Amino acid sequence: MTKKIAVFPGSFDPFTNGHLDTVLRASRLFDEVVVAAMTNTSKRALFSSAEKLALIEASTADIANVKAVAAPRRLTVEFARSIGARFIIR
């Protein structure tokens, strides 16, 4: 059976309780959820990429099938394909 991998992209500046709720719900539907902290150059960031990643990791540490990554600057669909994700969470 194919592993169901989903990516949850966003600027997450900051990562909120609403984002966490979405991740929790997704973690019940998919084998793996990748929270992809992306850079939005049209927005002025409150937190650095490293700070955002640390906040996401701390918030999701107790959810076994969730991992956080700093996504490279490219189209979301290209990133999803590169990690084998067939689903994008919005």
Protein language model features and the residues they cover:
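Nucleotidyltransferase catalytic core that binds NTPs
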Residues: M1-R90
